[in-house]
């Protein structure tokens, strides 16, 4: 479902190459020589390098020499185990069997060394991720009732000769399991060796079993589906198909805590609607701003994990209050998951649901802003999101301007623009995660132009509409072995938005790209978010509805 929506949404997105050309903030920042040059210190990826004062000091020195003006340090990773001295949150003590220094305070070290070097330091927290599938001990496991409740479909494959096997949906295949893909199947991930597949028609008849490996492009027949399996599961598929038996699918809806699902992502999300969760997250932000001289707070994963959450009783009550009536059929009035894996069937309350979830996130961000600014008004508030705005409703977020409307999107609820939260942030980092720096290069390579940093940056500006500063953000791993393309991607971010955020430090270090950064940032400059009065000027001077 999400892959199809992604392509549909993206195809509607990048239609105007000059989307950011009329940005008032871009022009002001150029005139004043302001540019966000931000590097992210991921907690887990850089654990060894940053687990001592010496390592931090050396890294900060290199950042200063590369003319970086802002460091974002991850102090509450997705595990919910923090890397500062907290009286509220549990501390990280080890990772992958490696002990973390008991009395070491990463945030204190980065703030001290960063400020010595004249670099602003912003503390990042993974807001609604409070646990990791690979590391126990996070608050999500201690407080199971905090976890998001995910709407699942328990499926099994049955045969006309009386056999039945449990079934995984897409995103596999898993060792020893059968997976099913619906009629909208396309490229299916990296398949393991000895993978067998059969195409099943609408009447249950199966094609001859065949083997496939690697990245396969498989299409299910109209009204039918594809079954895949490897090892024993693949052998069972072949044997059953060869026998002439027919396949059918059976299923029933199920509600599960996210830690109990087959979620391939590591993060265990807690419910953004839960008042106890909100109070806990706000207390962490309050603690950081009160105890540390941070220049900013950055909110990562301030969202739902996917479209299938949250279906808890807590959320149901709040949703019914939001729409002013009881939901007669839960969850089908919102949407129904199909028997054959594929797109959801939207119910009569689907658009209300999208607006409700986005409003929950906007309202929470308003609380965050009020909390942080009441302690220290000068602390900047940043947000990290994906740049694929037209499909970001999937995770319950509208990071655009409250004046940005896109009714041509078939999912867009009436008044959805009111849930946009760009006006509540001091800056937004949008992940422009594409391997092609420019539209032209994407087209030259036979790809659609939206698969470019340039297009993603322009659409980010289009959605935010100068409501706040926008920094195009790069995933450096996508440029491994291509420093020239990395440099061009940085230039696109600097040209189309008000700066560039680099994710992550570990790749700059591993690829030894400090010299590339010096090329991209030849002279020191200040960041736009260090001049917040520019936002007031931009917002107050903009015509209504612009």
Where are these regions (language model features)?
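Hydrophobic faces of well-ordered beta-strands that scaffold small-molecule active sites
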Residues: 37-41, 71-73, 121-123, 297-300, ...
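The substrate-binding groove and active-site-proximal loops of carbohydrate-active enzymes
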Residues: 41-50, 88-104, 263-282, 347-362, ...
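Catalytic domains of carbohydrate-active enzymes, especially glycoside hydrolases
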Residues: 54-81, 291-292, 418-430, 496-499
């Amino acid at each position: 479902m999400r892959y199809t929506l992604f392509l549909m949404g993206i195809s509607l997105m990048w239609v105007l190459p000059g989307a950011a050309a009329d940005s008032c903030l871009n022009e002001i920042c150029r005139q004043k020589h302001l540019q966000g040059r931000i590097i992210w210190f991921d907690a887990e990826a850089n654990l060894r390098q940053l687990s001592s004062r010496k390592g931090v000091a050396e890294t900060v020195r290199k950042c200063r020499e590369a003319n970086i003006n802002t460091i974002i340090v991850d102090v509450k990773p997705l595990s919910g185990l923090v890397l500062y001295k907290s009286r509220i949150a549990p501390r990280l003590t080890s990772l992958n069997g490696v002990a973390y220094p008991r009395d070491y305070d990463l945030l204190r070290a980065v703030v001290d060394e960063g400020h010595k070097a004249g670099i602003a330091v912003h503390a990042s927290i993974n807001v609604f991720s409070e646990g990791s599938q690979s590391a126990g001990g996070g608050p999500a496991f201690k407080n199971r009732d905090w976890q998001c409740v995910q709407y699942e479909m328990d499926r099994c494959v049955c045969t006309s000769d009386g056999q039945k096997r449990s079934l995984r949906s897409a995103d596999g295949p898993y060792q020893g399991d059968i997976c099913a893909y619906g009629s909208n199947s396309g490229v299916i991930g990296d398949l393991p060796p000895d993978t067998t597949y059969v195409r099943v028609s609408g009447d249950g008849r199966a094609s001859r079993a065949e083997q496939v490996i690697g990245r396969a492009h498989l299409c299910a027949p109209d009204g039918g589906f594809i079954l895949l399996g490897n090892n024993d599961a693949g052998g069972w598929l072949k044997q059953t198909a060869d026998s002439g038996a027919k396949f059918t699918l059976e299923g029933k809806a199920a509600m599960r805590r996210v830690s109990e699902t087959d979620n391939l992502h590591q993060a265990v999300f807690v419910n953004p609607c839960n008042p106890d969760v909100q109070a806990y997250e706000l207390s962490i932000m309050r603690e950081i701003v009160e105890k540390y001289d941070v220049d900013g707070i950055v909110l990562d994963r301030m969202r739902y994990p996917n479209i299938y959450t949250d279906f808890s009783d807590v959320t149901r009550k709040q949703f019914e209050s939001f729409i002013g009536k009881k939901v007669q059929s839960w969850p089908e009035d919102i949407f129904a998951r199909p028997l054959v894996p594929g797109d959801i069937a939207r119910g009569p309350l689907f658009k209300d649901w999208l607006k409700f979830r986005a409003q929950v996130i906007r309202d929470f961000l308003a609380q965050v802003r009020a909390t942080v600014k009441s302690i220290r008004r000068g602390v900047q508030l940043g947000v990290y999101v994906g740049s694929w705005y037209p499909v970001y409703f999937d995770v319950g977020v509208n990071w655009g301007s409250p004046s940005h409307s896109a009714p041509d999107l078939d999912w867009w609820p009436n008044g959805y623009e009111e849930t946009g939260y760009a006006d509540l942030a001091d800056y937004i980092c949008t992940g422009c995660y594409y391997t092609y720096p420019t539209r032209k290069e994407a087209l030259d390579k036979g790809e659609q132009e939206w698969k470019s940093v340039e297009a993603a940056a322009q659409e980010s500006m289009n959605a935010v509409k100068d409501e706040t500063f926008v920094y195009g953000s790069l995933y450096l791993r996508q440029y491994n072995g291509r420093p020239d393309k990395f440099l061009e991607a940085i230039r696109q971010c600097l040209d189309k938005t008000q700066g560039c955020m680099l994710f992550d430090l570990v790749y700059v270090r591993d690829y030894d790209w400090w010299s590339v950064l010096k090329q991209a940032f030849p002279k020191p400059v200040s960041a736009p978010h260090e001049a917040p009065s520019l936002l007031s000027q931009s917002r107050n001077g903009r015509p209504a509805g612009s």
